[in-house]
Design a protein with these regions (language model features):
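Structural/interface elements that position substrates and couple domains in central-metabolism enzymes
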Residues: 1-388
Length: 388
């Protein structure tokens, strides 16, 4: 089959590479740099497995900035472009997705359009009506940044928001490229699939918020947070995973997906969803105040990325603490080797790690890394288990 993949971020790239094992795939992106990298079998994002796959596997894969030429004669067109959360409208900005749908329908009306971008509940029904077509389906992704291809090769489940032959075919294409056997396939209605994505990420955010609030309680009471978490997590109903305290949940998906789900509730009574959103801000305020109590003159921010093995700066939790410290007049220095500029939010960006270490009084690091072992006394982190 011929498949077009529009948007070559974590989701689009991992899907394009997986599907190119057994199909002709053309990736589309507005970034010429990303297109050139993919055509040269280089990954434009940090993902070790993806880089290895591109180097070692025989893939029927090419990339282009020309959308119309790329989707011509395609059987499926996957849209995986960003849907940023608009704080003014309290909804995802789906304008880019809608623009691509419009262009694909005009160029290749026979293609089945599969939305992989995260969308609000009811979006598929809305665009089917506005574009007067049923050729649009939704298949949510459940990928981790930095491990997107691995999560496609070993998926927890494949969900498609339609009970139809074309939905089964698409799910089969994803399963065909995966290494995992006996993958759970789930075919639902469109709104159910949209809700599955938002509720999944909101549950993960809730778990992060829960263990962060446990950690805040332990810090305030000067008791052993690690011992409490270990004791709680030994209950098999709770589990010893996704329980490492942090500066808050961050990254591209969890902050915006929780807010979108809250907006989707509208007039439906709820308490937990609002509490999850609010808890993330409360955690950052609490930790910022702890740091301020130390009366530092200069605070260092070690990496802006969301987590180890990621190159994503978007909505990383450490930025929330950084902004709160700056609002109190604290001088901040940022160490971020992936940042190609000299300042970040009016703070100096230091590219020399040695200079960075001796310049600041306290180093904030969401996750502890070996690079900071020689200055452990300076490091402020809530990483208790050495994992994400």
């Amino acid at each position: 089959m011929k498949i077009g993949v529009v948007g070559l971020g974590d989701v689009g790239l991992s899907n394009a590479v997986l599907l190119a094992l057994h199909n002709e795939v053309i990736g589309v992106d507005i970034s010429q740099e990303r297109v050139d990298a993919l055509n040269n079998r280089k990954s434009p994002i940090i993902d070790q497995e993806l880089s290895q796959f591109l180097a070692d596997k025989q893939l029927n894969l090419s990339a282009s900035t020309d959308l119309n030429a790329s989707v011509k004669d395609a059987d499926y067109v996957i849209i995986s472009t960003p849907t940023d959360y608009n704080e003014k409208t309290n909804f995802f900005d789906t304008s880019l997705v809608q623009d691509i749908i419009s262009k694909v329908i005009k160029t290749e009306p026979g293609a089945c359009i599969v939305i992989k971008s995260t969308i609000p509940v009811g979006f598929i029904d809305e665009v089917r009506h506005s574009f007067e077509t049923n050729a649009i389906i939704y298949s949510p992704e459940f990928l981790r940044e930095g491990k997107a291809l691995k999560d496609n090769l070993y998926p927890s489940r494949i969900v498609v928001g339609e009970k139809s032959e074309r939905a089964k075919v698409f799910a089969g294409l994803l399963a065909e490229g995966a290494n995992k056997q006996d993958i759970k396939l789930l075919f639902t209605g469109t709104r159910e699939a949209e809700a599955i994505k938002l509720f999944s990420n909101t549950y993960l955010a809730m778990r992060v918020a829960f263990f962060n609030e446990l950690d805040s309680y332990a810090l305030a009471g000067e008791i052993d947070s690690k011992a409490i978490i270990e004791g709680v997590s030994l209950d098999p109903r709770i589990g010893n995973h996704y329980n490492n305290p942090s500066f808050g949940y961050g990254g591209y998906c969890l902050p915006k997906d929780t807010k979108q789900l809250l907006a989707n509730y509208d007039t439906v009574p709820q308490n937990i969803i609002r509490a999850i959103v609010d808890a993330n801000s409360t955690r950052k305020e609490f930790l910022a105040n702890l740091i301020l109590e130390k009366k530092p003159s200069k605070v260092g921010i070690f990496r802006l990325v969301m987590k180890a093995g990621s190159d994503n700066f978007r909505q990383s939790s450490i930025q929330g603490i950084m902004k709160r410290l700056k609002a109190k007049g604290i001088e901040v220095v940022v160490y971020e080797p992936e940042l190609k500029k000299t300042t970040f939010f009016s703070s100096h960006v230091e590219t020399d790690l040695t200079i960075f270490k001796v310049t600041v009084d306290i180093i904030l690091s969401n996750r502890m890394v070996p690079d900071l072992d020689d200055v452990k006394a300076k490091v402020f982190t809530r990483d208790l288990f050495g994992q994400d």
